[in-house]
């Protein structure tokens, strides 16, 4: 099959899978837990605006291992948002990805981090997200996998489902 002048065998390509960061790959609460009380009070109601908070966060349980397993069958990208009023969040998210997945050209997410408030603009087969009705996820063309839902409460359930679909 030809696509825009490039010869491709569509059936041989991996499906595209986007993965959200906050509360999917990254345990947002772990960053909050590391803040001092003064900062928690100052930023109450908008803790994602705390400068540097994203650098403090730990991975969700087994998230890193699960992603490596999914990479065997899928073409992976991270698709996340970053708070508009917290410029450090944009940098911290990139640094978090480098810390947990590497930063050389052969690393899993090298130049595969997309930060957007319009997830619907990305075309793919699957999106794993904990907020399926926010930031365009509800208009995503592929299937949205609602992380931390009854059907997909954890990474184990997500991996089992997606490995069957690959």
Over which residues does each language-model region extend?
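Short, Lys/Arg-enriched N-terminal segments with co-localized hydrophobic residues
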Residues: 1-11
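Active-site neighborhood of HAD-like aspartate-dependent phosphohydrolases
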Residues: 9-57, 151
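Conserved Lys-Pro-Asp/Glu-containing loop-to-beta segment of HAD-superfamily phosphomonoesterases
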Residues: 16, 108-136
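Short catalytic/ligand-binding loop motif for oxyanion handling, primarily in non-cytosolic enzymes
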Residues: 26-29, 78, 85-89, 121-123, ...
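Substrate-recognition element of Asp-dependent hydrolases with the DxDx(T/V) motif
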Residues: 58, 63-91, 97
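Active-site donor-binding segments of glycosyltransferases and PAPS-dependent sulfotransferases
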Residues: 87-119
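Acidic, Mg2+-coordinating phosphoryl-transfer loop and its flanking beta/alpha structural elements
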Residues: 126-159
């Amino acid at each position: 099959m030809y696509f825009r002048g490039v010869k491709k065998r569509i059936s041989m390509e991996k499906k595209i899978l986007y993965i959200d960061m906050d509360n999917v790959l990254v345990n947002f609460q772990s960053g909050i837990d590391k803040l001092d009380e003064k900062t928690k009070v100052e930023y109450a109601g908008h803790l994602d605006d705390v400068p540097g908070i994203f650098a403090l966060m730990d991975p969700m349980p087994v998230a890193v291992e699960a992603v490596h397993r999914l990479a065997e069958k899928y073409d992976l990208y991270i698709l996340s948002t970053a708070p508009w009023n917290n410029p450090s969040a944009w940098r911290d998210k990139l640094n978090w990805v480098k810390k947990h997945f590497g930063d050389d050209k052969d690393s899993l997410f090298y130049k595969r981090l997309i930060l957007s408030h319009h997830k619907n603009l990305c075309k793919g087969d699957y999106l794993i997200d904990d907020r399926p009705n926010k930031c365009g996820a509800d208009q995503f063309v592929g299937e949205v996998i609602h992380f931390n839902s009854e059907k997909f409460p954890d990474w184990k359930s997500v991996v089992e489902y997606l490995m069957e679909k690959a």
